[in-house]
């Protein structure tokens, strides 16, 4: 078995947008569950009104404006956590790119993009669908974007195994 070392930590979660905020919130027993704000839940058919949404996230702290526009929110969260982890590690620019790998866990990938583009198709027609539709939503794009950003040439993959995703990624 090969040795793997986790040298930095980053987090974007319903209780904090950094590892430090997340840890402090967990220690304090803070819940990240609250009313859904990401979409309208007023339809009587929508029985779920609560969720653990990420709050007050600003992707511009981690990505260029053009890259934000071409990426789904799940990928922006992954990039933010990766940037934080790299900063925490102190290794950025000081590591052999062949030894730097990226593993990202995503339960489903870019669902926001999928829903948005389906609505665009229905309301505006086929010609209005974004050329970035597929690259934005596929689950492995987050790992790919992170690998590109940090010039990682080691293993790069996305693990998509539902509730076991985080354990498999580690």
Q: Which residues fall in each region the model found?
A:
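Conserved "HGTGT" condensation-loop signature of ketosynthase/thiolase-family condensing enzymes
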Residues: 1-108, 113-155
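Short conserved active-site loop signatures built around small residues
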Residues: 166
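Active-site histidine-anchored catalytic micro-motif
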Residues: 169
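Short loop-beta-helix segment that forms the pyridoxal 5′-phosphate
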Residues: 155-161
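Pocket-edge positions in alpha/beta enzyme catalytic cores
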Residues: 70, 161-162
